[in-house]
């Protein structure tokens, strides 16, 4: 098993020193994730590309997923690599691998070459293509729009026959840009905005303002952990939770109805700015889009921005909602966002779309800012890697089982795509598939006289969901860990 990883082209327009630093960081990121998830897979930096190889295909799917979800990679080539003696040897190797592929098909050979050789790339294409055309009678050469394109690369004394081409994530390697603090709510917007900055090379830390109690926090932690685990697990990042209910209570009591939405957003930014300053983070990230809600008009955004000296980044500012949802679907956060409650919109009945500075300041003069400072001081921070551990510790009564008791039902809570790729079938056991994002609404409709064993691939989501269900009063749930 061998993959050739091509870094994003923007890396190569940098100066030599920056290019070397970026590719070294990319190599390190790949190695960290691969070592955490696989065994006996080697990573080598070859200056203009990175090679990932192993003696077996045992971890093929895991490695391919890692490489196609790691920021900074433009494309991943799956190759068969070998030594060669001369042009004819290359032709014979290509014939052995491609003979069956081109039978009764039109084909073309495309070659790239780097190093010192006694032939050019065009000569290589002509020699190999001509040889294949003579050796496979049912095949024919077609230079434009052929059925099969045979791609080969010759690098010094190595021949790479490209078996498959996989699109990478693009962007910059994680850690090449400065850290950011994302104001995450668990909805469509904040998940996508966080992802976009991970893709661009920033370590994204998460700040959650809790307005909905433990269940809301569990849901948001799931989103943050998912984003980190899928796209940025080479980095150590923080999850900070701020209990904002006292702040909301003070706003409801002291601030005029029409100003509540903008004042709440200003309090978010003040608090996030304090958190960012504590960790020496220069910028905040939000999922705000222009005009999406009343607090996101240009006038209101300007009034929101002035309360902190941190740079506020809004990568979705000109996006339509359907565009945001499409990206959420593509990156895997849509299912989380579908069932995430929205709390911010409920506190103002007639929100202003064009706040006035003097009126905002007059309303905030009634606000007790000691409350804001207190909730920030009491904020709880954790290493995002500990979210899985916390789920087990927070709910020690959630039993994990390997054996399935009589009459128990296994609930496969993986997403439909995961379930389709690897269906869970257990002889003699009833298995139901309810995706995790539907569990909260559908679990109550099940036969509550039975015991339900929650299953997911790694056991993280099943523990978090079991905790949530037990908080709702369901004590007939366990975690199935075969």
From Swiss-Prot:
Q: For the THUMP domain, which residue ranges apply? A: 61-165
Cellular component GO terms, alphabetical: cytosol
Q: Which GO terms describe its biological process?
A: thiamine biosynthetic process; thiamine diphosphate biosynthetic process; thiazole biosynthetic process; tRNA 4-thiouridine biosynthesis
What cystine pairs are annotated? 344-456
Top-level EC class = transferase
Keyword check for Calcium, yes or no. Answer: no
State its location(s).
Cytoplasm
Main location as per UniProt = cytoplasm
The record places the active site at: 456
Pathways involved: Cofactor biosynthesis; thiamine diphosphate biosynthesis
UniProt keyword annotations, A-Z: ATP-binding, Cytoplasm, Disulfide bond, Nucleotide-binding, Redox-active center, RNA-binding, Thiamine biosynthesis, Transferase, tRNA-binding
Reaction catalysed by this chain? [ThiI sulfur-carrier protein]-S-sulfanyl-L-cysteine + a uridine in tRNA + 2 reduced [2Fe-2S]-[ferredoxin] + ATP + H(+) = [ThiI sulfur-carrier protein]-L-cysteine + a 4-thiouridine in tRNA + 2 oxidized [2Fe-2S]-[ferredoxin] + AMP + diphosphate; [ThiS sulfur-carrier protein]-C-terminal Gly-Gly-AMP + S-sulfanyl-L-cysteinyl-[cysteine desulfurase] + AH2 = [ThiS sulfur-carrier protein]-C-terminal-Gly-aminoethanethioate + L-cysteinyl-[cysteine desulfurase] + A + AMP + 2 H(+)
Single Gene Ontology MF annotation: ATP binding
Q: Which Pfam families match?
A: ThiI, ThiI_fer, THUMP
Residue intervals of the Rhodanese domain: 404-482
Q: Which residues bind ATP?
A: 183-184, 265, 287, 296
E.C. code: 2.8.1.4
UniProt function note: Catalyzes the ATP-dependent transfer of a sulfur to tRNA to produce 4-thiouridine in position 8 of tRNAs, which functions as a near-UV photosensor. Also catalyzes the transfer of sulfur to the sulfur carrier protein ThiS, forming ThiS-thiocarboxylate. This is a step in the synthesis of thiazole, in the thiamine biosynthesis pathway. The sulfur is donated as persulfide by IscS.
Q: Name the HAMAP family for this protein.
A: ThiI (MF_00021)
Q: Matching PANTHER family, A to Z? A: TRNA SULFURTRANSFERASE
Annotated family = Belongs to the ThiI family.
Q: What is this protein called?
A: tRNA sulfurtransferase
- State the organism of origin: Vibrio vulnificus (strain YJ016)
Which gene specifies this protein's sequence?
thiI
């Amino acid at each position: 098993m061998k993959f050739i990883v091509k870094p994003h082209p923007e890396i190569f327009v940098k100066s030599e020193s920056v290019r070397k630093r970026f590719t070294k960081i990319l190599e390190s990121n790949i190695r960290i994730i691969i070592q955490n998830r696989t065994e006996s897979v080697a990573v080598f930096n070859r200056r203009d590309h990175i090679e990932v190889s192993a003696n077996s295909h045992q971890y093929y799917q895991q490695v391919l997923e890692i490489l196609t979800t790691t920021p900074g990679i433009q494309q991943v080539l799956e190759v068969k690599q070998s030594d060669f003696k001369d042009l004819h040897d290359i032709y014979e190797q290509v014939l052995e691998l491609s003979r069956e592929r081109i039978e009764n098909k039109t084909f073309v050979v495309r070659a790239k070459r780097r190093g010192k050789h006694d032939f050019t790339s065009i000569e290589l294409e002509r020699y190999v293509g001509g040889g294949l055309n003579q050796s496979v009678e049912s095949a024919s050469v077609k230079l434009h729009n052929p059925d099969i394109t045979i791609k080969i690369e010759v690098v010094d004394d190595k021949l790479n026959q490209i078996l498959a081409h996989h699109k990478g994530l693009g962007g910059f390697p994680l850690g090449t840009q400065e850290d950011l603090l994302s104001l995450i709510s668990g909805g469509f917007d904040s998940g996508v905005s966080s992802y976009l900055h991970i893709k661009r090379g920033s370590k994204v830390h998460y700040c959650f303002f809790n307005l909905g109690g433990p269940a809301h926090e569990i849901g948001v932690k799931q989103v943050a952990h998912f984003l980190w685990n899928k796209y940025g697990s080479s980095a150590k990042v923080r999850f900070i939770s701020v209990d904002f209910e006292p702040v909301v209570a003070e706003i409801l009591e002291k601030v005029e109805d029409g100003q509540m939405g903008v004042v709440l957003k200003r309090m978010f930014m003040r608090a996030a700015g304090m958190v960012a300053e504590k960790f020496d983070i220069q910028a905040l990230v939000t999922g705000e889009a222009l005009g999406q809600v009343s607090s996101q008009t240009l006038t209101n955004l300007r009034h929101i921005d002035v309360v902190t000296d941190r740079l506020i980044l809004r990568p979705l500012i000109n996006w339509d909602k359907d565009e945001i949802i499409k990206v959420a679907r593509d990156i895997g956060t849509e299912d989380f966002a579908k069932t995430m409650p929205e709390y911010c919109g409920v506190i103002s009945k007639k929100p202003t779309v064009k706040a006035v500075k003097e009126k905002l300041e007059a309303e905030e003069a009634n606000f007790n800012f000691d409350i804001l400072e207190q909730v920030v001081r009491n904020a709880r921070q954790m290493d995002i890697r500990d979210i899985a551990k916390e789920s087990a510790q927070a709910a020690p009564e959630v039993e994990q089982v390997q054996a399935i008791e009589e009459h128990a039902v296994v609930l496969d809570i993986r997403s439909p795509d995961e379930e389709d790729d690897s269906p869970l079938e257990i002889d003699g056991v009833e298995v139901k598939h309810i995706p995790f994002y539907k569990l909260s609404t559908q679990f109550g409709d099940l036969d509550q006289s039975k015991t339900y064993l929650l299953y997911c691939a790694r056991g993280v989501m099943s523990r978090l969901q079991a905790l949530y269900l037990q908080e709702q009063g369901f004590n007939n749930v366990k975690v199935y860990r075969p």
